[in-house]
């Protein structure tokens, strides 16, 4: 995680966490955020045993719809990998019994919205959210949802 994305300013720009300064921050983040998640996946390349990103159910939105969040190492942006990963996770979450799934992105990161649209998600609203954990700064987000087919 640290080598591939948590220390990268380009990746952290649109995430709710600041770039990690050293591996101990990533270790803390992993222990306190990711490992407790009931639905959490690492993204890897076929035949490789190194994570290049992740997808998690990060909570519920204000109307009780579970939301996913995702991240990918910068060198893999724009190659269709996140769309493939999100499609697989949505399929698995629906298989597990979820009826509706949501996702949101910072309006300054329209590529993330394109991933959501390619995965069949529909725009539902704009909202405001904390830009970074531990900050009072807000950012505008676009929210999408998809219902079980």
How does the language model describe each region?
Residues 32-37:
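Short loop/turn motifs at secondary-structure junctions and domain boundaries
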Residues 1-8, 13, 40, 44-149:
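Acyl-donor (CoA/ACP) binding surface of acyl/acetyltransferases
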Residues 10-31:
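Conserved GNAT-fold acetyl-CoA-binding loop/helix
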């Amino acid at each position: 995680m640290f080598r591939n994305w948590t220390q990268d300013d380009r990746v952290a720009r649109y995430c709710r966490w600041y770039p990690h300064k050293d591996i101990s921050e990533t270790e803390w983040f992993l222990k306190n955020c990711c490992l407790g998640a009931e639905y959490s996946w690492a993204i890897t390349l076929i035949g490789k045993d190194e994570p290049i990103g992740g997808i998690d159910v990060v909570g519920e939105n204000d109307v009780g719809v579970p939301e996913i969040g995702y991240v990918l190492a910068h060198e893999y942006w724009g190659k269709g990998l996140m769309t493939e990963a999100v499609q697989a996770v949505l399929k698995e979450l629906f298989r597990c019994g979820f009826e509706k799934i949501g996702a949101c992105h910072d309006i300054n990161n329209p590529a993330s919205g394109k991933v959501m649209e390619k995965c069949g998600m529909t725009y539902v609203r704009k909202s405001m959210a904390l830009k970074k954990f531990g900050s009072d700064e807000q950012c505008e987000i676009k929210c999408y949802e998809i219902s079980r087919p």
